[in-house]
Amino acid sequence: MVECPPIFLSRDTMANFNTHLNTALIITGLTSATLLSAGHIDLKDALWLWFLGSIGGLLPDIDSDNSTSLDTIFNLFALSAVLLVLHYITTELIIEISFIELIVVPLLVYGFMKYIIRPIFEWITVHRGSCHSLLFLLLCALLTTQVTWKLNDQTTAQAATFAWLTGGFILLGGLIHLLLDELYSVDLSNVTIKRSFGTALKIADFDNKLITLASILAIAGLIYVAPPTQQTITALSDWSHFTFLS
């Protein structure tokens, strides 16, 4: 009698931290370079989008049980928050910031992320739960879009376009992460599927109905107050200035 190989392996394997980061760096870097070549963004915006896309590539692991990965992820989030706050203070409020304030503000933002936001996430999340879902990525993307929109001049079409791009890069990085996790759940050499298959790339964590409902309501609200889309679609549809090779 011929025995069939087991469908599920006893030990789960998933993409590690470096794989997630490096893949997100490559793909989002190429994407931002493409937008730069087409004239949709300038170099400063391209670098910022690349940074956000790389963070998006780590975003689902914000519920990680690994303290080292969690430290790195939250440090990157804190850095992003610090840069956004300083950008808002110096460009939108148009005030001079003293040396002491330049030290105190980042420390306050970092402390808020580390001692308030992080414990909340650790308390309400489990690994490969709500954070490993399309609903969570969409929520984060729309939230990033809204924050960027509010921190910039809302009267210009360029601001709306850039706001949508920031959210898009967060979403792109997150999708890369989830796809990698699912790819690592399939053993192509033995044609077997690991037990972790299907736990990463899912619409929502329906086991946690309260968080899922809250996420849906938040997404609906963010869509309602989102920046205009028509100008963004029109701008990003023009690829006449794109140069692949000069």
What are these regions (language model features)?
Residues 2-246:
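N-terminal membrane-targeting hydrophobic helices
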